[in-house]
């Protein structure tokens, strides 16, 4: 078995974000660290985010930080990864890629505690940076320029300190003095010696004990630029809970030094400066016995002002400012700012935005409505209690509608699936194409997300029409690219026998003064020349000038016009009988007839190419009769309407043609452009001339062909010779394909209308074709208005629809259904198709907990706050308004209930309406961990079984009781009725239906239960499994069981003996997270370290187990070292780079092959595609081997070592690496493709086909 790995959905979790001017312009950009990839984000003035570049690094990115050289104009990126190397990246805006500027090796590969890469700190002036490990090692590199002004890096300078654990690191702003770096660390030398010198467990032992015994230190490391060495300049003790150190602007911009964040306090520290301490305010309802801890931070600096924005573990944002004079700080001011969802990282941008990379859920870009200066300075002090704690009432906590944000306003979101807890591919709403159902998030951010392949759209307006239109067009106010007003003025809708003209403004109204003939069917409306309009109808055409003067041309004789096409200077019409007449605009902006040509066959389609840059006329026209072929004709005067190339369609009827220019960064176009500009020519292949010709037109010309059978063909049209090459085919639907040109992100795009609506557009330099989540359309046109600069107007039956496309670049659009608590599992009712979700929350506030007993001090302060508000506002004590203001916070901000406190729900949901039919809450303290439906015996009635635990404590693990709850579906499956509970000894994490009974994993035992009158009856059991059972699959008489620590076990059930026998297991111990049966002998599994593997039972063993004539073979077989008597064969292995949470065997294409679909905790969705031919295996294996040597990973990690992180990669080809082929320069593409005996275009075509035909 050979598999091909492809990523469908990129990782959506963001572990770190940085901002800077990476492209060298003044535009602020954001770089996101997704753990295994980097992404560059830009946003417009409206705060809408757009992904500019996404790149896999084929390694684990541990940290990133930006820096700018002194007097530089652009920012660079320093990356710390698992490669044992430090890498400096530069964003190349011309090629839209990250270029590796420097790569320095300093240690071993892997995420090790003593290998630097976990922490990065940069001197604020860009002169040096420090890279540090969790323990011991710290290296300093000096940054400089060479004689050519290129960035250079020095040899590393060591700043190691043994037996030291680092918690945080930053650069200290000292102006242009010797660079200084600050760290928060703790020395565990005494702890290490007291434990006997054991190096392996010293950190863990120290963390488990009271850290107060060991003093945390703030240490300054100075880089002496003269002596070229690093010394520890200063060290002082800080709070034991200190966890973050932040740089304070220095020199002429501030006092310098650092801020240290610890539990309950923000402290200003600097050498030769007294400590200045400020208490962090607390929210109402928080536990007074637990301090406030800062988890993320950012800062903003501008001329004459700077401030810090930090976030607590509750989601509260605090603004920190300093009162200082010179280099002396007198006070640290910490004021409540706003409350948002918990963020892994905060990034304050220079132009008034805040990016919050959420820990779980969507990431948000906020606009600063204000920076909190108008907050009363004495507000916090006025709420100070006798212990010195400061209290405040939070706003908009975690997305609840308590009170709107005061200082921030969300402007844009990046969708995130992280973490994916459970995942299934189903077609519950009968849409033909399956939907992807995902349980995501935790706590208040929990949701069920329904993913559909395609881009989401926003419908702006919909209106009914008097009939079914035959076409729709828009007319701009001005065709000049320099025009101030680029909006459209008319929407023209054609019906049978009539035409309607609509004016575009604040409202859309009918217009009768446009000069357009309204008493006929319109075939084409197009802007031409100096704001003129051409209208083509069956009997002729009208040329309407900007001053409404009309020139009309009539078709000769009894002939009628059947097809027409035009650009801004040319018009071609096709008459009945097969005659083509070609017109051009003269210098007086009048249309003059140039030539006629009779093709002697009825014309089905005609299309004129766009006008290239630097020319006045287009050079080619494409025409076709109904059965093809498609002919490309020249429009040059010396060979006007002469054939230059041809495309065969195998006599399939043609529906539409379109020629469009797109800026495609593929097949080494940039290299060929540079060669063309220097006069070099290359004629190796047809694709070479195609790439070089794009220089003339500013982009690549593509001919799209829509066929009657629902297939679209795409060919590259050479803008010099007119030759067609690189032909690609895609099935879009069941109906004929109509093609319409639109604008997306200011660039040309193509809308293909079939049984689904598809969009062809350029995404990060590549041509993507994705469906739109909208009803089938029949006609479409681009529309620009004051309300929406880029929208589309279309018709569907007798309706007109105006819509815009959201979130370009996404592969799936999402529909979110909010949940009450953290989801655990969901299943589908086999008869009603209802979705059954099990939600379980630990440390949860249950309704019977008395808040006054838990947090009397917080409640007292609430009442005091209420009295103060009443006195200030002159409101009586019995006024209900003030009570309404305070009461919701008492309910929302109750303290955590503590360990062993759980709340669980069983929710039944309609998959079509998303209505919650039942939300059954389990008893207080009862936690549900597993769920399945089961039909006992031959009755056919479906029951629901839930594995529950009461008062469970996770660490150390303990529980009061465990049981199986059996529920009956009532009211047509919409409600649940509890029948009884069955006590078990250990928690049940996995269960399944098995031959009319229930099989479940009770601790490390496998049990089979049957239904009884008062409880489930134990029928069979085996205790021969090592630890805890987390997965169970049944097929025939076999059970495939996943152990939490010991991989996969095959179990045989002997019905005659009513016995279970473990007869095969894995050789390697694996910490299982998910598994799926591929066939009777094969299983795919995943572990928590990111490995996906395939195991197979040897055929000989499988036959022996099934054909045991004595019936006693399994009974007397025994393995060695407590293992099974037989071992599974290791078929395939692959390291994904992230913890895999689910595996599914499914088909994503109707009638397509089955694939293994996997999801990760970071929100990524990937697929393993089985190969069906040896030829494909050889092709992709050779391609992968060449890509490993010619496309080195961005962060210096060896690709083969990365994919073999824990086990050697076997029989799985990395499709993500193979798809990097299109980013290589042309010479590398050519050398690799020659080894494959193909051209570069054929290699890219092969890569596209395996994704489109077998996945989406």
UniProtKB/Swiss-Prot annotation:
GO biological process: mRNA splicing, via spliceosome
Low complexity composition bias: residue spans: 674-696
UniProt-listed Pfam families: Beta-prop_RSE1_1st, Beta-prop_RSE1_2nd, CPSF_A
Any single GO CC term annotated in Swiss-Prot or TrEMBL for this entry: U2-type precatalytic spliceosome
One Gene Ontology molecular-function label: U2 snRNA binding
Subcellular location: Nucleus
Coiled-coil region list: none
InterPro entries referenced in this protein's UniProt entry, alphabetically: Beta-prop_RSE1/DDB1/CPSF1_1st, Cleavage/polyA-sp_fac_asu_C, RSE1/DDB1/CFT1/CPSF1, WD40/YVTN_repeat-like_dom_sf, WD40_repeat_dom_sf
Record has NADP as a keyword: no
Broad class of the protein's primary localization: nucleus
Keywords: mRNA processing, mRNA splicing, Nucleus, Spliceosome
Domain of life: Eukaryota
SUPFAM superfamilies: NHL repeat (SSF101898), WD40 repeat-like (SSF50978)
Listed Gene3D superfamilies: 1.10.150.910, YVTN repeat-like/Quinoprotein amine dehydrogenase (2.130.10.10)
Region (Disordered): 671-696
PANTHER family in the record: DNA REPAIR/RNA PROCESSING CPSF FAMILY
Role: Involved in pre-mRNA splicing as a component of the splicing factor SF3B complex, a constituent of the spliceosome. SF3B complex is required for 'A' complex assembly formed by the stable binding of U2 snRNP to the branchpoint sequence (BPS) in pre-mRNA. Sequence independent binding of SF3A/SF3B complex upstream of the branch site is essential, it may anchor U2 snRNP to the pre-mRNA. May also be involved in the assembly of the 'E' complex. Also belongs to the minor U12-dependent spliceosome, which is involved in the splicing of rare class of nuclear pre-mRNA intron.
Family (UniProt): Belongs to the RSE1 family.
Quaternary organization: Identified in the spliceosome A complex; remains associated with the spliceosome throughout the splicing process. Component of the spliceosome B complex. Identified in the spliceosome C complex. Identified in the spliceosome E complex. Component of the U11/U12 snRNPs that are part of the U12-type spliceosome. Component of splicing factor SF3B complex which is composed of at least eight subunits. SF3B associates with the splicing factor SF3A and a 12S RNA unit to form the U2 small nuclear ribonucleoproteins complex (U2 snRNP).
Protein name: Probable splicing factor 3B subunit 3
Gene: sf3b3
């Amino acid at each position: 078995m050979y598999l091909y790995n492809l990523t469908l959905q990129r990782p959506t979790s963001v572990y770190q974000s940085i901002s800077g001017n990476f492209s060298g312009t003044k535009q602020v950009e954001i770089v996101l660290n997704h753990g295994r990839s980097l992404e560059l984000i830009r946003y417009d003035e409206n705060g809408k985010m757009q992904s500019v570049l996404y790149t896999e690094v084929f390694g684990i990115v541990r940290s990133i930080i930006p820096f700018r050289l002194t007097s530089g104009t652009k920012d660079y990126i320093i990356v710390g990864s698992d490669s044992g190397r430090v890498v400096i990246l530069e964003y190349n805006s011309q090629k839209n890629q990250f270029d590796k500027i420097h790569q320095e090796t300093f240690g071993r590969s892997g995420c090790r505690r003593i290998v630097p890469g976990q922490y990065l700190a940069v001197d604020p002036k860009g002169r040096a940076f420090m890279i540090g490990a969790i323990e011991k090692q710290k290296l300093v590199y000096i940054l400089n320029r060479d004689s050519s002004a290129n960035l250079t890096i020095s040899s590393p300078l060591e700043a190691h300190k043994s037996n030291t654990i680092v918690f945080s690191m930053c650069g200290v702003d000292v102006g242009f003095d010797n660079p200084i770096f600050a760290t928060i660390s703790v020395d565990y030398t005494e702890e290490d010696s007291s434990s006997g010198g054991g190096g392996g467990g010293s950190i863990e032992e120290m963390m488990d004990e009271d850290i107060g015994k060991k003093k945390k230190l703030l240490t300054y490391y100075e880089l002496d630029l003269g002596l070229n060495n690093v010394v520890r300049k200063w060290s002082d003790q800080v709070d034991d809970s200190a966890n973050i150190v932040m740089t304070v602007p220095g020199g002429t911009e501030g006092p310098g030094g650092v801020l240290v964040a610890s539990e309950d306090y923000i402290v200003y520290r600097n050498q030769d400066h007294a400590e200045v301490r400020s208490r962090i305010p607390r929210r109402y309802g928080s536990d007074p016995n637990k301090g406030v801890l800062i988890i993320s931070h950012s800062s903003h600096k501008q001329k004459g002002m700077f401030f810090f924005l930090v976030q607590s573990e509750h989601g509260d944002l605090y603004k920190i400012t300093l009162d200082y004079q010179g280099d002396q700080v007198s006070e640290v001011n910490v004021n409540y700012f706003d409350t948002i969802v918990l963020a892994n990282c905060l990034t304050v941008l220079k132009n008034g935005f805040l990016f919050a990379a959420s820990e779980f859920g969507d990431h948000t870009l906020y606009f600063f409505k204000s920076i909190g200066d108008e907050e009363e300075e004495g507000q916090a002090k006025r709420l100070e209690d006798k212990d010195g704690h400061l209290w405040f009432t939070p706003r908009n906590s975690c997305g609840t509608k308590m009170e709107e944000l005061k200082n921030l306003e969300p402007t844009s979101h990046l969708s995130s699936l992280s973490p994916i807890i459970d995942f299934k591919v189903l077609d519950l709403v009968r849409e033909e194409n399956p939907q992807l159902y995902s349980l995501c998030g935790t706590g208040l951010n929990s949701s069920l997300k329904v993913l559909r392949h395609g881009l989401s759209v926003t419908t702006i307006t919909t209106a009914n029409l008097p009939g079914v239109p035959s076409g729709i067009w828009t007319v701009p106010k001005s065709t000049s690219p320099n025009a101030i007003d680029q909006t459209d003025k008319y929407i023209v809708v054609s019906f049978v026998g009539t035409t309607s003209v609509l004016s575009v403004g604040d409202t859309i109204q009918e217009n009768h003064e446009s000069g357009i003939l309204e008493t006929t069917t319109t075939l084409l409306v197009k802007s031409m020349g100096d704001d003129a309009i051409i209208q083509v109808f069956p009997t002729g055409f009208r040329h309407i000038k900007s001053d409404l003067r009309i020139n009309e041309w009539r078709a000769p004789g009894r002939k009628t016009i059947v097809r027409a096409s035009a650009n801004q200077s040319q018009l071609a019409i096709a008459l009945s009988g097969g005659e083509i007449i070609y017109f051009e605009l003269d210098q007086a902006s009048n249309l003059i007839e140039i030539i006629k040509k009779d093709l002697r066959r009825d014309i089905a389609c005609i299309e004129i190419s766009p006008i290239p840059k630097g020319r006045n006329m287009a050079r080619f026209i494409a025409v076709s009769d109904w059965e093809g072929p498609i002919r490309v004709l020249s429009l040059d005067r010396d060979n006007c309407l002469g054939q230059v190339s041809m495309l065969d369609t195998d006599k399939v009827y043609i529906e539409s043609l379109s020629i469009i220019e797109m800026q495609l960064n593929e097949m080494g176009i940039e290299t060929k452009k540079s060669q063309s500009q220097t006069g070099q020519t290359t004629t190796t292949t047809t694709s070479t001339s195609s790439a070089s010709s794009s220089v003339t037109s500013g982009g690549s010309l593509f001919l799209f062909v829509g066929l009657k059978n629902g297939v679209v063909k795409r060919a590259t049209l050479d803008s010099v010779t007119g030759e067609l090459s690189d032909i690609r085919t895609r099935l879009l639907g069941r109906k004929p394909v109509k093609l319409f040109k639109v604008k997306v992100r200011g660039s040309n795009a193509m809308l293909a209308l079939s049984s689904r609506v598809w969009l062809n557009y350029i995404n990060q330099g590549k041509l993507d074709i994705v469906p739109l989540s909208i009803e089938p359309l029949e006609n479409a046109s681009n529309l620009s208005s004051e309300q929406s600069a880029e929208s589309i107007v279309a018709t569907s039956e007798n309706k007109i629809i105006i819509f815009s496309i959201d979130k370009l670049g996404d592969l799936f659009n999402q529909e979110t259904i909010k949940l009450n608590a953290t989801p655990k599992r969901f299943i589908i009712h086999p008869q009603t198709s209802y979705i059954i979700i099990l939600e379980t929350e630990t440390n949860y506030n249950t309704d019977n907990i008395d808040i006054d007993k838990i947090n009397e001090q917080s409640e007292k302060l609430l009442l005091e706050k209420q009295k103060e508000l009443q006195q200030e506002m002159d409101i009586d004590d019995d006024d209900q308004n003030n009570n309404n203001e305070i009461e919701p916070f008492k309910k929302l901000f109750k303290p955590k209930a503590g360990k062993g406190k759980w709340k669980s729900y069983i929710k039944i949901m309609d998959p079509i309406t998303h209505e919650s039919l039942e939300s059954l809450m389990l008893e207080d303290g009862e936690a549900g961990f597993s769920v399945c439906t089961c039909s006992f015996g031959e009755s056919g009635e479906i029951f629901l079984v839930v594995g529950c635990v009461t008062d469970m404590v996770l660490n150390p693990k303990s529980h009061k009781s465990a049981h199986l709850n059996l529920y009956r579906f009532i009211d047509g499956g919409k409600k649940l009725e509890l029948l009884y509970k069955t006590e078990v000894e250990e928690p049940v994490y996995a269960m399944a239906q098995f031959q009319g009974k229930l099989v479940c994993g009770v601790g490390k035992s496998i049990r089979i239960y049957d239904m009884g009158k008062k409880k489930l009856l134990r029928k069979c059991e085996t205790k021969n499994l090592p630890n805890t059972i987390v997965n169970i699959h049944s097929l025939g008489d076999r059970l495939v069981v996943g152990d939490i620590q010991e991989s996969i076990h095959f179990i045989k059930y002997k019905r005659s003996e009513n016995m279970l026998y473990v007869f095969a297991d894995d050789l390697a111990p694996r910490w299982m997270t998910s598994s799926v049966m591929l066939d009777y002998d094969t299983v795919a599994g995943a572990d928590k370290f990111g490995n996906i593997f395939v195991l197979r039972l040897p055929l000989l063993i499988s036959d022996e187990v099934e054909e045991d004539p004595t019936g006693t073979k399994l009974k007397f077989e025994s393995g060695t070292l407590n293992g099974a008597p037989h071992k599974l064969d290791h078929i395939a292995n692959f390291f994904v780079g992230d913890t895999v949470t689910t595996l599914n065997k499914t088909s994503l294409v109707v009638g397509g092959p089955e694939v293994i679909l996997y999801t990760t905790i970071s929100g990524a969705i990937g697929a393993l595609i089985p190969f069906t031919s040896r030829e494909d295996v050889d092709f992709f294996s050779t391609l992968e081997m060449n890509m490993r040597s010619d496309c080195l990973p961005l962060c210096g990690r060896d690709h083969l070592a990365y994919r073999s992180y824990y086990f050697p990669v076997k029989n799985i080809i990395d499709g993500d690496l193979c798809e990097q082929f299109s980013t290589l320069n042309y010479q590398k593409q050519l050398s690799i493709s020659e080894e494959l005996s193909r051209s570069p275009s054929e290699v890219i075509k092969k890569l596209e086909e395996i994704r489109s035909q077998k996945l989406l």
